[in-house]
Amino acid sequence: MGDDLCVAQVQEWADGLAELSALIGHRFARSEPREHAVAYIQGLLSAEERKNSWTLSERAGDATPNGMQRLLSTTDWDPDLVRDDLQRYVVRYLGDPGGVLIIDETGFLKKGTRSAGVARQYSGTAGRVENCQIGVFLTYAAAAGRTFLDRELYLPKRWTEDRDRCAAAGIGADVEFATKPELAMAMLQRAHDNGVPARWVTGDEVYGQYSRLRNKCEELGLSYVLAVGVNQHVIAGPGKLDGQELRADALIAALPPQTWRTLSAGRGAKGDRRYDWARVRVHGINFPESVYWLLARRSLSDQTDLAYYLCHARAAGRA
C-alpha cells in the first residue's frame, strides 16, 4: 500500500510537470530553451541544496552551465507572458474566492554595482542598509495552498535617471521610476486581469501608508488589512470623538481598557502567538462616506509595543 502510494504520488508529480511544460512551452520558439526551461523547473523543485546555473545544469546532464545561463539572460522569451500563464495555472488549482493576496519585499545582498537596481538601501531581510537589490513580490494564500504570483524589481531613482547604466544592465528605455507601492498596485491589477480570485490584501507599513494603494484595492473590489504607522491620521468613527482627525496611536490610546481582547495570531516557530487586540471604527480617508476599522495589536509582555492596521471589508463581509 505504501509503495503503491509512493509510485502514484511520483506519477502525479510527473503528470503535473508535463502539464506545466505544455502550458508554457509555446513561449519558447526553439526546442533547446524549451527543454532547459523544463529542466530548470525540475531543478528548482529538487532537493538540491545549492540551486544555481552550475548545479541545475549538472542535474540536467549538461557539461556546462551555458544553456541555463542563456535561458536566463539572452534567450528570446517573455517572462511576463510566462507569469500570466502561471497565474492562470494557479487559478486552476488553488483559486479560492476567499484567497489572500500578500504584498512583501525582500533584499538580495550584492557586492558589485552592475546588477540591475543594486544600491545601498534598506533591506528588511538584513535589517539594515546594505548594498542590495530589492524585489517586491505578490504571493497568494488559499485553503488549497500558497504560492508566488508576481514580482517586480525596485529601481531607485539614481538608476532610472541614468539611462546609460540602465542600458548596460538590460533595462529598457521605457522603464520609469516607480515606488514600491506603485509596483504592488501594478501586480494587483495584473492578478485581477488574469482572473485570480481573492478577497483580502495584506501588506506591511510600506504599502499600508500609501493611500493610492488602498484606493486600488477598493477599486478592484478587494478588502484589506494593511499595516500603518503610529502617525497615520484617521478620522474617528461613531462615538465621542466622531469626526475628529487623530493619529492612530492617539485614537487607540483613548479606548477604554475593556476594549482589548487577547487572541491568537496563529502558531509560529515558538508556538502560539498571542496578543492583545483592539479595534475602533473610523471614517474612510480615501472615501469619507465609507466606514473602516483601525485595528491595534499589543504585545502581552510589553504594552508599549503596538502595531496598527487599517482594515476595510466589502459590504458583504466583516472587517
Regions found by a protein language model. Give the residues of each.
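Conserved, well-structured functional cores that handle cations and Mg-NTP chemistry
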Residues: G2-V201, V206-S223
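An anionic, glycine-rich sequence signature occurring as long contiguous blocks
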Residues: A18, G127, A144-R165, A169, ...
